[in-house]
Every structure is written in C-alpha cells, then in structure tokens.
Amino acid sequence: ITVYKANMIIPQIAENLTQSGNLIIPDVCPVCGGEAKIIKSNDVESLYCMNPDCQAKKIKAFTLFVSRDAMNIDGLSEMTLEKFIGCGFIREYADIFHLDRYRNEIVTLEGFGDKSYNNLMNSVEQARHTTLPRVIYSLGIPNIGLSNAKMICKEYKNDLEKIRRATAEELSAIAGIG
C-alpha cells in the first residue's frame, strides 16, 4: 500500500498496490443468518443486518443504552448484557430497571455476587434520575447523538410530548441540526 499523511497526523491509504486486501462482502449476517445489505447514508456505505431480531444488533443497542453518555449504568458491560439477555432477564430497555426480580439468579452467575449485584442495583437506581437528553440519546435514534439530543431538548424546553410530536422537518430546522 502507499500511505500519505492526512490532517497532519492521520495516515490515509492512497493505493493498494497488490490488491491482496479485496474482501467478499457478505450477504448474510454472521450472527443470525439474516439478510445483510449495504445501505448508503450521507455518502457513506455501511453493511447492515436487516433482521430486526438479530441478537448482535440487540446487544449493541443495549450497550449504547447503558453507556456512560446515555443512561450511565455501571456494571452492565456488553458481556454482562449478553448473559442477562441469554438468561431472559432483559428483553427490552425497561427490563433493566426491574433486574431486582432476578436477584437470586444474578448473584449465582459467574462473576457476580452480592456486592456486584448491589453495585449494579445502585447504578440502575441512579439511572432513574437522569436527564431527558441522555434518555433520547440512549434510544439509538439514527443521527441523534448526545449533542443533538441536548439541542432538541433545549428547543422544546424538555417537553417530551412536544418532542414526540415533532416532525422530521421541524427537527431538521433546529439550529445546529439540519
């Protein structure tokens, strides 16, 4: 390959001289076996699994939901989420706030005990008292990062009903978003 320096620091590949790095793009998701498609959005092409029930997509969605910038639930790593989803403790976001129903099962899981469970429950309790921008960001809405969520909430004065009724055109008209 030939490489050049882009933006002062970041190396950028200019050319693949041997063409040895050609990959066959899969048309099937390696996790669930569902159809995989390339979707172009804002001049960027990305490969997506089209199965809405894909386990990998669910785990990534839950991982974003509990992340530091979102609901900030410490103790729910991607691996722990996989375990809890596999055990049936979590099926939707709201289930995270009712993990106390599974206390006896959770404390017997490998890597968990009373202390880990209590720390997790404290973190879940703190997440109940978060801000609306964090909740909106945590939902994983395309093109709505934390800063856009903050701008939307500011525009609509944290009125969830007004935000829910807003059209795509109205949201795009907000300064800094469109």
Language model: regions and residue ranges:
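Duplex nucleic acid-engaging cores and interfaces of nucleic-acid transaction enzymes
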Residues: 1-2, 29
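Short, surface-exposed secondary-structure boundary micro-motifs
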Residues: 3-7
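Accessory alpha-helical DNA-binding modules that contact the DNA backbone or grooves
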Residues: 8-178
